[in-house]
Amino acid sequence: LDSIIHLTDEQFYQLCMANKDVNLELNAEGELIIVPPVGGESGRNEADLIIKVGNWNYQTKLGIVFSSSTIFRLPNGAKRSPDVAWIKLEKWQALTEEEREKFPPLTPDFVIEL
């Protein structure tokens, strides 16, 4: 079946901003995905991993760490938010201010998905 609605990057961004209490993603085919909340154990494990990657990054100062609240615009058109993401500092610095403020148009260098 064909999708009824095709969202531009800006329309998807506005949809997410208007519905901040709902975690949304788009797959490469443009299908909207509602991401359910996680339970206590999964949330605790996710937080543990963010702390560990964050501590490593704090020591090395090689990049930027992101939580599952950050959506990345991937080259295949998908808009995804991994549980933990890390990006090399030079990739982050190459983005414009607007790209940093909205959904960064890049693939993280490292992700963890629980």
Q: Language-model segments: what does each one mean?
A:
Residues 1-114:
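Gly/Pro/Ser/Thr-rich low-complexity, intrinsically disordered segments predominantly at protein N-termini
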